[in-house]
Amino acid sequence: MGFVPVLIQPANAQASNTTSDKLIAIDILLQPDQTMMSKANAVNDRLRENYAAGYSLGARHAPHVTLLQRFVRVKDLDTVTAAVAEVYAQNPPIGLQLKVEALDYVIWGGVAVTVFVVERTPALMQLHEKVIAAVEPFSMSGGTKAAFVGDDANSETIGWVEHFIPASSGPKYVAHVTLGVAHEDFVKAMKAAPFNAFTFGVKGAAVYHLGNFGTAAEKLWQYAP
């Protein structure tokens, strides 16, 4: 499904060369309504039954639809969120209706990271592209696990953020909601089962500090229209 990042150097990211330019890995995301939360938690329960070392959804693993993941300097966070707020003022995200088309997975760190694949509607793509343009002047490269919450960010997680542009953006953007992790054979069977598509709404928008497996681990900013 195009969910695995291609390790290509982003053309529009600057390198961070000084210790004063501390980087943070951020996720500019949409927050789903209760319909999605209920569906996501139901799948997560099944995943954790199969893989007890997995994580449960909640405040430190918030279900979401990513618009953009980037490394930025900590000192630029206020400017970044102001730029994103300007995009949302002209392109309101709250109330958008989105459709889940399928369940899929990718292998990261030896486990199957499981997701709902979300339809790329014109409104969603417009938000994605405008947020990229707004954040581009502040995007940095060279982030390490120190840029994430905790100290366990694996190479796949770091690479995903580093190479989100161009490997996971524009025509390669796969909108999704991450549901948790489990053993591949279990998730492969889930994927093969009949799937009932469903719609859900966007109730909010925020910026989070990323954790391992691309989880939304700590809220940094909440959009207030």
What kind of feature is each model-predicted range?
Residues 10-107, 121-206, 210-225:
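Basic, often amphipathic N-terminal segments
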Residues 108-112:
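Acidic/polar active-site rim loop that often engages polyanionic ligands
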Residues 1-6:
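Bacterial N-terminal signal peptides
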Residues 115:
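Surface-exposed, active-site-proximal loop segments in enzymatic domains
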